[in-house]
A protein has these predicted regions:
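Short alpha-helical functional segments enriched in proximate histidine and acidic residues
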Residues: 18, 22, 175, 179-182, ...
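Short catalytic-site patches enriched in acidic/histidine residues
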Residues: 35-45, 147-152, 156, 187-264
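Short amphipathic alpha-helical leader/targeting segments
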Residues: 54, 179, 253-254
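Conserved short loop/turn motifs at secondary-structure junctions
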Residues: 118-123, 180-189
Length: 264
């Protein structure tokens, strides 16, 4: 685990207080960053249905994932085994079966189907179909938008989080120095970004880096008008500007950095 159990318990209590203030009895969090914040789960499985379910009075949240990824939950979270809920592979790509059928059954079995449920209505990977599944499958619940409840709790960082962000910042600095060194006229963009990525993953002698939530962005020349373009096999041109946007990452904590360089 990247944090102590006490850290996770403190986060849970803050979320539950906000839930109480908003009149939410059960929160279903689909945001992958929120799942990590509440449980420690960080497997690369966001593209399938998964969530953390928080009851306003529970001692621990529930981590709900597909069977294939359940090992990641057992390894990476602080939760008791009984609070890791697994849905079978039969729900994957077998319409009309859907993973949310399983989640709805769990909520019914726990007799939570008459509670006020908060949903992250503007969260990535929570589709309109997922919402309809919940609305139709739990007709006796009151559904409401959680309004980025967990995200707002996350805004105030703990000392432990800030320590990780400072480490990520050092990796960002190293990656940016590499970028400025390797971006030169006549160099292929892909070659430059390869060196940048290498630097970001190598990290420092004290701590290694890891993949980031954003690709290294490297728009150059007229591409600078588009901001979010990635490297191609084209070469850098003397007299043109290049925007560098990257982030060092340490234990999933980012510290992004952006700079503009002019060649020549």
């Amino acid at each position: 685990m990247n944090f102590s159990k006490e850290e996770y318990k403190t986060r849970l209590k803050k979320v539950q207080k906000s839930m109480h203030d908003k009149g939410i009895e059960l929160l279903i969090s689909h945001d992958t960053a929120n799942m990590n914040y509440l449980t420690g789960y960080d497997a690369w499985s966001f593209y399938y249905a998964q969530a953390v379910v928080v009851h306003v009075n529970a001692e621990e949240p529930l981590c709900w994932v597909r069977k294939q990824d359940s090992g990641g939950a057992y390894i990476k979270t602080y939760l008791k085994d009984e609070n890791i809920l697994v849905y079978d592979e039969k729900y994957i790509h077998t319409w009309p079966l859907h993973p949310y059928d399983n989640l709805i059954n769990i909520i019914k079995e726990k007799k939570w189907d008459k509670l006020t449920i908060g949903l992250e209505m503007d969260s990535h990977y929570f589709t309109a179909y997922c919402y309809e599944k919940i609305r139709q499958g739990l007709p006796n619940t009151k559904l409401k938008d959680a309004e980025r409840l967990v995200n707002w709790v996350r805004v105030v960082k703990s000392d432990a989080e800030i320590t990780l962000m400072k480490s990520a910042a050092l990796i960002s600095q190293k990656g940016m120095k590499t970028a400025i060194d390797v971006i030169n006229p006549g160099v292929r963009q892909c070659d430059a970004v390869g060196e940048i990525q290498k630097s970001l993953f190598y990290g420092t002698s004290e701590f290694g880096g890891e993949y980031s939530s954003i690709a290294t962005l490297l728009p150059t020349g007229k591409g600078t008008s588009a901001s979010h373009l990635t490297a191609t096999e084209e070469k850098f041109v003397e007299g043109e500007a290049t925007i560098i946007e990257l982030s060092g990452v340490y234990k999933r904590y980012h510290c992004p950095m952006a700079r503009t360089v002019l060649l020549g």
